[in-house]
Amino acid sequence: MSSKSRTKLFAAQKKILDTRAASQYNNSVRLQPPKVVTPSKWLTPEYDGRYRGRYLQMAKDAARRHGIPENLFLRLVQQESNWNPQAKSHKGALGLAQLMPQTARLLRVDPLDPAENLEGGARYLKEQYRTFGTWRLALAAYNAGPGAVKKYGGVPPFRETQNYVKVIGGG
């Protein structure tokens, strides 16, 4: 076999091996870097609240840790508690992100600890986003509960929830 033929044979074999290796790599979840899911830029209006205290940075950090648009989470906390860590709703929701006691237990956070409450609120909102696929429906589920969003196949026809989604999401 001539050296020219060997070179062609080697090139052909190398091409086959490269193609196989690329195919195996593309099909291997283990070797691929983790997929980064960037939350959609859901045109959330800028946070325009006056609050600039210590909980603001905690809320921003919690939003970033969980991949939530910062302005969305800041507006949620503003709407939920007006940045009052001792806030308690008529339905029993507690703290900055207004977690229901049973939700806080499931998330294993102390709803009266501001840092844990914000962490729990961000985790819960992200969980709703993963379940429903849009921030609009995640907000509706955060407010009315995931069961209501499932039951109605979208934002429930409750005035409070519709207003909540509109105020936080901007439309």
Q: Language-model features: where?
A:
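Substrate-binding/active-site groove segments that recognize
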Residues: 86-109, 117-125, 140, 146-147, ...
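Solvent-exposed, acidic/flexible segments
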Residues: 45-56, 65-66, 70, 89-93, ...
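Cell-wall glycan-active module
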Residues: 1-75, 171
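Mid-sequence acidic-hydrophobic segments that form the walls
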Residues: 79, 128, 171
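Hydrophobic recognition helices of helix-based DNA-binding modules
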Residues: 125-128, 132, 149
